[in-house]
Structure formats: C-alpha cells, structure tokens
Amino acid sequence: MKQFISEAEPDRNGTLTLTGKAFTYLRKVRRMREGDSLPVLLPGGRSVMMGADRIDDGKREIRLRLQTVPQQDENIAATATVESPAAAQTEIILLQWILKGAKTDTIVRQAAEAGVHIIVPVIGEFSVARKQNPAQQERFRRIIKEARQQSGSPIDTRITEPAPLSAVMQHTVPPLLGSGTVCGMCSEAAGTALSVHTFLAAKPARIMLAIGAEGGISPAETTMLAAAGFKTIHFNTNVLRAETAALYAVAAMQTIRNEADQWQLPASIS
C-alpha cells in the first residue's frame, strides 16, 4: 500500500501541517482532496491513518489529522493504525558497484522498493563513473524516500557514501558482520560457485551481497572479498546486465529466505 513518509510527529492535537514538496506530493501526485485519507509512516516507525481535513491551494498548505477508531467505551477513541507488511526473514545489505549514467539511480530505487536495509555504493576498478557528484547522495536519499512511499516499504533503507572497495571493507563492512550473516558475490561464471539454496541453507538473519559494475568485479576485488569470507554465487540463467543482476539477486534471496520453511535441501548438501 502506498504511504506518505513524514519527517515530523503530529502535534498534541494530532495534526500535521505540510507545505513545500510534501504539499506537492500529496496534492499533485496523490491528488488528495479534503476528506481523503492515507497511511502515514511516522519518524518512530509507526504507521497511522491520517485524513486531509483542510487544504489551502493558495498557501500551498495541507493539514492532516490522525484518524480514530471507536472503542468499546463510546467516550474513548484510539488512533487508527496501519498493519505493516509481514516482516522479512532476513536483512539484505547490497554492496553495489557504481554503474554509468542513471543506472545506479535505478538500482537504488528498486532496492528501496524491495526492502533492502542498507545500500553500499562501491567505486570499483571497472566502474566507468568514478567521479561522484556532491549532490548525488541527496538525490539517492530522495529516490529512496519516493520509492518507499510508492511501495509502502516499512524498511528505513539507508545508503552510505560511495567509496572504493578497500575503504568499504575497512570501515563499512566490519560493523555489519556477525553471527547469522552470510556474504556472497555474484558471478556470471559457474565454476565452483554455490547455488543460492546452498548459500542460504543456514537460514541467515542477514545477507551481504556484492554486485559488480558493467565489467564485473575485478580479480583484485574478488580476492579481497574472498579473504573477507564472501562466497561466490552463480545464478543458473542468462548473462544479466549489471542493473538487472541487482534486482534479480535481491528478489531471489528474499523469496528463497522468506519461504525457507517450505523447501529443504537434502541432508548431504545442507
């Protein structure tokens, strides 16, 4: 279900007064009218229903008010909350090599829609776009917010500053490792790579996934990842473009992990 992500909590009267980009989104994109309601995700992570009780197009201002539901005691009303989607069985951290043009923007949007927890942009040896625009990070955050509003994702997807793999492995990755974490790097070559089911056989609580750029992951980067415990994963399908591989991999990991209780590897493999 689509949602609006609020940067502020309602006031003591249960209202939010919105202007600027928030007004534009609700009025022009969502086409809200007085009396309409929608789910609002608050800063603390709670999702509530709010209705538009006043719209001033002249001032470009819209006021939302918490909706209530009657309780058994007619003198008491409770805030109408929104049931969140079923929680994912695992967290996904995506180490995504920077791609050329707007392809990285596409991956960021799709990852946020799919509920990836953390996106780590990597400036790889084969990355064509090595110089980063200072405004890029703010654009990424805006893309993530728009994607979460469109998809209704309750996951507060975060994105780190783009950095070379050496810096990522030194500063970003270590705090995210721990028991219940599995790390994999995707490869178009089968070789001795693991199947996805084998990779996820232990039902990990966290998956760290590395996806290369247009030219893949360099030999030096592969060695660095392998030394950190990353296993090579291969999808038994066609050769995928880098921007396709990211969504394909995330979807495969989520589906297999979320449905882990419905399949089982032979004991000799697991």
Language model: regions and residue ranges:
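Fold-independent oxyanion-binding glycine-rich loops
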Residues: 7-8, 20-21, 43, 97-98, ...
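Short, ordered loop/turn segments at secondary-structure junctions
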Residues: 69, 123-127, 237-238
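RNA substrate-binding interface of SAM-dependent RNA methyltransferases
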Residues: 74-184
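Structured adenosyl-cofactor binding patch, chiefly the S-adenosyl-L-methionine
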Residues: 219-270
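Active-site/ligand-binding-proximal alpha/beta "capping" segment
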Residues: 175-224, 230-234
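N-terminal positively charged helical leader segments and presequences
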Residues: 1-83
